Amino acid sequence: MVGSRVYVGGLPYGVRERDLERFFKGYGRTRDILIKNGYGFVEFEDYRDADDAVYELNGKELLGERVVVEPARGTARGSNRDRYDDRYGGRRGGGGGRYNEKNKNSRSSSRYGPPLRTEYRLIVENLSSRVSWQDLKDYMRQAGEVTYADAHKQRRNEGVVEFASLSDMKTAIEKLDDTELNGRRIHLVEDRRGGRSGGGGGSGRGRSRSSSSRSRSRSRRRSRSRRSSHSRSKSRSRSKSRGGRSKSKSPVKSRSRSRSRSNKSRDVSKSKSKSHSRTRSRSPKRERDSRSRSRSVSKRESRSRSRSKSIHRDSRSRPPTVSFKSSFYKFTTMPFFCSDRSASAENKSRSRSRSRSASPKNGNASPDRNNESMDD
């Protein structure tokens, strides 16, 4: 069956039919799987399942290798060139590509080909979830040439359709707006933000923007970056020249000022550090002196207090009889004994003084007396 066969390229070494069955599982029933050296073919029962598989699995990894999933055209034994010519043949409205008169009116041949993005875009609202992008594209061909179609990719129950010309887009709005598609009435709204990146499209492989839009965006970015870099370089050169001029005018003054300021700051920091160190060094000495003085004073006070306490204790510990005895001796014995002792002492002193005074006189008088005795 034409259109239900899929080409799988870039298969890893040692791949089996089971691997391909798992890879394509969920996209419909498969009729046949054929594996060759590095590539293979998978045939589905329905061509819609084949289109969905191409749309979703192209560029995915199989056993660690990225594979190419494309719709197969012609015989499997044909060369890649023959498959390329057959695959991209068809009407321009079916997505662009090579024009072929034989397949001009064939519906299946117009389904494949790279998408052509345009600015004439319509947003299809209230789209049934059972409607695929292929169904939407076929339905919109009633108004004109459809270059791109997508369904349920950005939002659910919403599709995108792009036309080849403005007139085709307007006829689609007039003719197909508020019509019923698969049980739902669709609404067509013009999207003035045309050129958005979308997936899928006419061939199932066109998920990137067209080359023209890419080249335009790249050229604009490059021009903007060049302008910004040019303006930045100009501003930098101006700032550098101004800075160089201002610096070249008075380099000596600025250096001398900076040196003097640095020296002043160093002197101030040194003086501050010295004063802090002096105060720190003096303060412990003062504290030590005050502590030693307070200790010595406290020791002296404690000593004097202990002495006074000991004296007071001694005075308290002495018996009162001593005082009575001393007073008794003073008042009773002193009159009797002191008079005799004093009289004897006085007599002794008198006799001594007389003997001292009389001894030289007697010595001087002794020769006279002797002489007198001799005369007699």
UniProtKB/Swiss-Prot annotation:
Residues 215-263, 271-283 have a biased composition (Basic residues). InterPro entries: Nucleotide-bd_a/b_plait_sf, RBD_domain_sf, RRM2_SRSF4/6, RRM_dom. SMART domains: RRM (SM00360). Residues 79-89, 185-194, 284-304 have a biased composition (Basic and acidic residues). Keywords: mRNA processing, mRNA splicing, Nucleus, Phosphoprotein, Repeat, RNA-binding. One of its GO terms (biological process) is mitotic cell cycle. One of its GO terms (molecular function) is mRNA binding. Residues 196-205 have a biased composition (Gly residues). PANTHER family: RIBONUCLEOPROTEIN RB97D (PTHR48038), SPLICING FACTOR, ARGININE_SERINE-RICH 1-RELATED (PTHR48038:SF3). Essential for development. May have a critical role in splicing or in controlling alternative splice site use of at least some pre-mRNA in vivo. Not required for all splicing. May play a general role in the condensation or decondensation of chromatin. This is Serine-arginine protein 55.
